[in-house]
A protein has these predicted regions:
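Acidic, PIN/NYN-like endoribonuclease modules and their adjacent C-terminal/linker elements
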Residues: 1, 104, 108-135
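Short, well-structured N-terminal submotif of metal-dependent ribonuclease cores
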Residues: 1-36, 48-64
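Active-site neighborhoods of divalent-metal-dependent phosphate/nucleic-acid chemistry enzymes
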Residues: 70-115
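Histidine- and aromatic-rich ligand-binding microenvironments
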Residues: 5, 37, 95-97, 118-119
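Alpha-helix capping/helix-boundary segments
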Residues: 8-9, 40, 78, 103, ...
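Residues at the C-termini of beta-strands that transition into short coil/loop
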Residues: 38, 75, 134
């Protein structure tokens, strides 16, 4: 099970990395369960809304979402997990942003791999499996 981070989705949509696009298409073809956090979806929706071409970008986002298994809503248990992660990272002196904490919580709670182009940030989260498909 994979959760895609916002930066990876954008790179796939803009086809900024042949390696990334090939891996994404391969995982889809193999039937790998690929999900988005509702937090990632929010970040993407915000980007579309503020863009110079919202209609075109909304269509592009809708097309991207077609093979995605589901958008996972941030629920009560995710909030509890996020609270634990944020407190732990703050105690260690290595906090990350609140949206990233929420995304990490959803992935870690479900024992999913977070696919990101920012391993340095997500590798701080104990017990979170992290992959970068651009490598």
């Amino acid at each position: 099970m994979y959760f895609l981070d916002t930066n990876i989705v954008i790179k796939i949509m803009l086809r900024q990395s042949e390696t990334l696009v090939a891996r994404f298409e391969d995982e889809i073809e193999r039937g790998s369960p690929i999900f988005l956090s509702s937090i990632v979806f929010y970040e993407l929706a915000y980007g579309v809304s503020k863009s110079a071409h919202p209609k075109r970008n909304f269509d592009r986002l809708s097309e991207f979402l077609t093979p995605i298994a589901d958008i996972i809503a941030f629920d009560r248990d995710d909030a509890l997990e996020a609270g634990d992660i944020r407190a732990e990272l703050e105690r260690q002196g290595f906090p990350i942003g609140p949206y990233d904490v929420q995304i990490a919580a959803q992935a870690r709670r479900r024992k999913a791999v977070i696919v990101t182009n920012n391993r340095r940030k997500f590798n701080r989260v104990p017990g979170l499996m992290v992959a970068d498909w651009t490598e």
